[in-house]
Amino acid sequence: MLPQEKLDLILRRYDEVSARLNEAVEPALYVQLSREFAGLEQVAAAIRDYRSQMQEVEGLAAMLADPTTDSEMRGLAEEELRDAKERLEALEHQLKIALLPKDAADERSAILEVRAGTGGDEAALFAGDLFRMYQRYAESKGWSVEIISANEGAAGGFKEIIAEIAGRGVFAKLKFESGAHRVQRVPDTETQGRIHTSAATVAVLPEAQEVDVEINEADLKIDTMRAQGAGGQHVNKTESAIRITHIPTGTIVFVQDERSQHKNRARAMALLRSRIYDEQRQKLDAERAADRRSQVGSGDRSERIRTYNFPQGRVTDHRINLTLYKLDKVITGEALDEVIDALTTHHQAALLADSESGGL
């Protein structure tokens, strides 16, 4: 049985926040309350559905316990009670999932970084394919995609591309995409029909706010330079490109896509903030990992998480042994949700097992 006192507290808080949102409050407080309301809304609905079903089960059980209930009604009630108990069990599971502790960053926008790995030109082309997959997926969700920095490959694709994906719940959807992605296919330049293997790495960082990370100007080394195009040639005459080094952590960011130095600096600072915030989160996660079974994969960015085999039309996620023979739909973003939803379900099941065994 679920702790009813805890459920009562959640419903009371939901009503309080709902009432506060209808009052005149400071803009900053309104944003804070709106976020809390969004988190409580799903849980409150799950509690009400569960309790409504519980009442139905209790009503049918009372009918069966009543000696005045005739045999025909008793037979109907027994059948309905079996169905009602099954529905109650499903709703209880859904409620337990809704009550699991949330990642504080789940509702945030995200920084997506895709880098070509081993495989030369083919790796850069694959990095381009991955970026377009996420771009199309984001567009299907109504999120916006803005490129922060891009370094194109000689034959196409990208050696590295960094973008901001803005929208509600972006990080929750994309956070399990971090890791090494491998592709197996016959390159266009391959005359013998041999399958080549190449790789690209993906990093998904929750977008950090200024309040999340304190950065002192004294800890920064800022270099300006002229932006460069493919092959290293200078593409403008002003020193608009920015490289910022955070001395305490050794984190370096470089942005040159905008013609304005001011805009490049703002983007570089936002990227730096998100990287430092992500490093802090990873450190905390690593400290907790020894006591938890809930992590999908090791969380290591170098871990090979997925293989895209073009000759077989196959996508395999190695962390949960998921194989889909619909690579054409996954690589266009159309069926990416099938992979993401399976990873999320696996993660939630592990979290639930942890909580029920006292692991959380």
Curated annotation (Swiss-Prot):
Region spans: Disordered: 283-305
Gene Ontology molecular function terms on file: translation release factor activity, codon specific
Stretches of the chain forming a coiled coil according to its record: none
Principal subcellular localization: cytoplasm
Disulfide bridge partners, by residue number: none
Pfam families registered for this protein in UniProt: PCRF, RF-1
Keywords: Cytoplasm, Methylation, Protein biosynthesis
Subcellular locations according to the entry: Cytoplasm
N5-methylglutamine: residues bearing it: Q233
GO annotations of cellular component type: cytoplasm
UniProt entry tagged with the keyword Iron-sulfur: no
Record PTM: Methylated by PrmC. Methylation increases the termination efficiency of RF1.
Source organism superkingdom: Bacteria
Reported function: Peptide chain release factor 1 directs the termination of translation in response to the peptide chain termination codons UAG and UAA.
PANTHER family, sorted: LD18447P
HAMAP family found in the cross-reference section: Rel_fac_1
Sequence similarity: Belongs to the prokaryotic/mitochondrial release factor family.
Name of the protein described by the UniProt record: Peptide chain release factor 1
Species annotation: Methylocella silvestris (strain DSM 15510 / CIP 108128 / LMG 27833 / NCIMB 13906 / BL2)
